[in-house]
Amino acid sequence: MQKGTVTLICLSNKIFPIAEACATVGIRVSCAYGITDRHGPDGARRGLAENERFLRAGGRGMVGVHAAFTCTDESLEAAAGLAADLNVGVHVHVAEGKADVEAADRLRPLATDDWLLIHGVHLDDDHGLAGTVVHNPRSNMNNSVGYARPARFANPVALGTDGIGADMLDEFRLAYVRHREDDVTASPEDAWGWLAAGWDLFPEAHHDRVSWDPVAPVEAPMDPWRLAFTTGVAPRTVEVDGEVVLADGRATRVDAEEIRARAAEQAPQLHQRLDEI
């Protein structure tokens, strides 16, 4: 929110707390529990049950799949079936790395237009999967999995971060320069289109309002060419569903400094537990 982001699409194994936290802060969220067979068939079944529990309780979300290559065909089919029963899509990591190059063949009979296909780095141009491809340039570079070249896809393409922050203007700039490195004819308007596709995933966010600092020219408040080369743009005020949730750069519903202080206190305990695993 302090970066002007008012919607979150999250794949996690703690979907109830995340949804509650987002509601407390005042932003929109869509959650999915990422099922996997890495812990055996029973683990995948429990993951599906958690997705169903969340969605039937009224949570906004999708059925989550950690990554196609960590799931059996039976689990993928079960996830697709549950999503169809609940009238939601599937949120799945697809062909992020070379280990998942067979994902398209496995998912093609299952995927529908309401699916989110995350990464898609190693998909063929004509992969034949229905759904929206979500491009995560910073994450892909960090993991050294390659460049997805998202402009090649016939699918709608949206922009994401894979959990590395929530500064979507910064992600837009990175998406543009990475595209430009690959294709000298690339324009900031291409990457801006990927960013704007997020509204198709959360149509109600069209009614939310963000005012920015420094103040943009009235004639071109969100010009892709200007923003591609202007860093340091930050939100001054954020309104979600008519409510001001950020005023003068500060959250109105919660004490952000207190939250950070409590997180700093708990971080060493978490690190110690991880060391003990």
What are these regions (language model features)?
Residues 57-169, 179-188:
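Active-site core of metal-dependent hydrolases
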Residues 167-170, 174, 182-193, 197, ...:
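Ligand/cofactor pocket segment of small-molecule handling proteins
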Residues 7-11, 116-122, 135, 195-201, ...:
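Short, hydrophobic beta-strand segments that form beta-sheet elements in well-ordered domains
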Residues 24-29, 46-49, 107-109, 150-153, ...:
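Short, hinge-like loop/turn segments at secondary-structure boundaries
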Residues 1-60, 66-82:
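Active-site loop-helix segments enriched in His/Asp/Glu that coordinate
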Residues 193-277:
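Active-site microenvironment of metallo-dependent hydrolases
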Residues 13, 120-121, 138, 180, ...:
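Flexible loop residues that form catalytic
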